[in-house]
Structure formats: C-alpha cells, structure tokens
C-alpha cells in the first residue's frame, strides 16, 4: 500500500487529502483544500494562497489516476466545491476534473446539519450525470483483494456538535490497513475509537483535537492513547491539532505514551519528507503582527 499525503495543516492548508494506491485500487480520500477566511482577525497570507493553489494542482494530478474519491462530510476542506473560489483554488470546472467518471463514496445527507445539507444539495446537483455517487455510511466494497469500509456516522467533535457528522474510511489490501478518521477532533468521542478497534489498522490517520480553541483535552488524550494501544505501526496526527504551533506540547502525553509502546507518530509533512509549514497558525507572524488575540468558538468550515 502506497500512502501519499496531499494537503493538510502541516503542509500549509486546511485539508486532510490523502492518495492511497494498492494492487487493485487507487483512491483519493477527501479531495478538498481551503483556507480560513479569518484567523487572528487576518485574511489568508499570500503564501497560504500559493500553497492552496499548489495543493489543488496535486489533487487534480492524482484525481486523474483515482478510481474512487471519498467525501467524509461537507465541510469545504474535505470536498471540491462546484464553483470558483480563491480560498479553495477552484474555478467553475474544477470539480468535474476531481469527480468526473469516478465512483464517489460520500456521506449520506440524512443526518447532516443545515449547512452541510445545503452544501450536499449543491454538490449532488452538480454531480448528476458527472460521477457515480454512492452514499457510504456503514458500507463495504471489494476491489479485487482490496476492501474499503466506511463507518457509520461519527460526531464532528463532541456529541451534539453544531458542526454535524462525518464518516471514516478503512482501506485494507491484505497486508496493511489504513484507518482514515477525519474531523473527529480528538477523537473526543469513543465511537471513533470503536471504528479503529473494528478495522485493526496498521496505519491510523486521525483528526486531532482543536487545542487552539481551548478545549479540555482529557477525552481526546485518553482516546488517542486507546488508539495507540491498538499498536498500529504508524499514527498520523492531523488537521485541527496542527492549527496550533504548540501542538506537540499540548499532546505531549500522547507522544510519550506512543514512544513507550513503539508506535511511530508522524504528521502529513513528515510523511511527505517536508518541513512543517503551519501557515495558518503562523498567520500573524507572516503579516508581521503579534498583537492580535486568538478567536473564540469554532467556525463552520
């Protein structure tokens, strides 16, 4: 199994896009990229805009090879929108290049919050006749010796979160099993851990806690330790966690726990052999400003 990191906060953008290739299948997980419209009261820096364009180019290049594309949920950093956007590096035709003639394994709209349901409607209308959309919640598919499995609905953060629900995916080729668990924000709820326990992963990619919002990390740390106890060879911490320049200190207990148990912890940047580029987290520095405080609350992405 080949795992290629495409876009994520350690690579300078909001995303969790991964490309995975097995003997039988080429799958592009969550082919989206976006930038925070405001952070520290500032718009995206030109370096962030450049990185968004670069990541979008890589998404398009890999989409040309992919058989399957996933949509874990309808936040704009996890799918390609069907309209032009500078912050998502799209024009009016980009979505066709990503999804056209593909099988799209997508989150069902039946239990979405209002904003995700609205985005789903716009995308579903655009993809009619363009792609084969399969609502994936709880499903399983076999491609030769490769099995793709989707979780049931998981909370995007704490139970009852206003940001809605997501689904996770597992890809297994008989030798490796990748668990791709986006935007569970920790995981803060045990349901995401249960999915990992069920699929017995050798590699786990998980959306970590949004430490920059000042949340209580006790549940996230506990659940990350439970994932470590599954003894994957690799744990990739990603996304919301990497919006904090002090993320290593915030989850230091997990890093030490993983080291004692022989589980390697990495970021997308490390997997890509690149230096971390926490551009959003360093936006004030990029603009040469230090006086602006952190925003409160969680935005809808």
Swiss-Prot record:
Entry protein name: UPF0282 protein Pcal_1546
Entry similarity comment: Belongs to the UPF0282 family.
Residue ranges that the Swiss-Prot or TrEMBL entry lists as coiled coil: none
Cross-referenced Pfam families: Lactamase_B_2
Stretch forming the signal peptide: none
Disulfide bonds: none
Organism: Pyrobaculum calidifontis (strain DSM 21063 / JCM 11548 / VA1)
Xref: SUPFAM superfamilies: Metallo-hydrolase/oxidoreductase
């Amino acid at each position: 199994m080949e795992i290629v990191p495409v876009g994520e906060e350690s690579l300078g953008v909001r995303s969790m896009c991964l490309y995975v290739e097995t003997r039988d299948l080429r799958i592009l997980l969550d082919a989206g990229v976006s930038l925070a419209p405001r952070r520290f009261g500032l718009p995206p820096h030109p370096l962030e805009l450049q990185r968004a364009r670069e990541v979008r180019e890589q998404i398009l290049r890999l989409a040309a090879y992919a058989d399957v594309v996933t949509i874990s949920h309808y936040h704009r950093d996890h799918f390609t929108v069907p309209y032009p956007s500078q912050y998502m590096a799209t024009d009016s035709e980009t979505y066709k290049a990503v999804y056209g003639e593909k099988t799209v394994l997508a989150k069902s709209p039946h239990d979405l919050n209002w904003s995700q349901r609205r985005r789903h409607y716009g995308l579903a209308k655009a993809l009619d006749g363009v792609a084969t959309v399969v609502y994936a919640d709880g499903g399983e598919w076999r491609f030769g010796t490769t099995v793709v499995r989707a979780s049931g609905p998981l909370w995007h953060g704490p139970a009852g979160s206003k940001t809605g629900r997501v689904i996770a995916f597992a890809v297994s080729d008989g030798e490796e099993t990748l668990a791709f668990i986006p935007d569970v924000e920790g995981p803060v709820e045990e349901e995401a851990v249960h999915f990992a326990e069920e699929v017995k992963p050798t590699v786990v990619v998980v959306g970590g806690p949004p430490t920059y919002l000042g949340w209580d990390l006790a549940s996230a740390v506990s659940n990350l330790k439970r994932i470590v106890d599954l003894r994957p060879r690799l744990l990739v911490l990603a996304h919301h966690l990497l919006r904090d320049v002090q993320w290593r200190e915030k989850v230091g207990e997990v890093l030490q726990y993983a080291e004692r148990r022989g589980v390697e912890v990495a970021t997308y940047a490390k997997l890509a052999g690149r230096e971390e580029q926490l551009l959003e987290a360093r936006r004030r520095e990029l603009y040469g400003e230090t006086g602006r405080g952190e925003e409160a609350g969680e935005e809808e992405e």
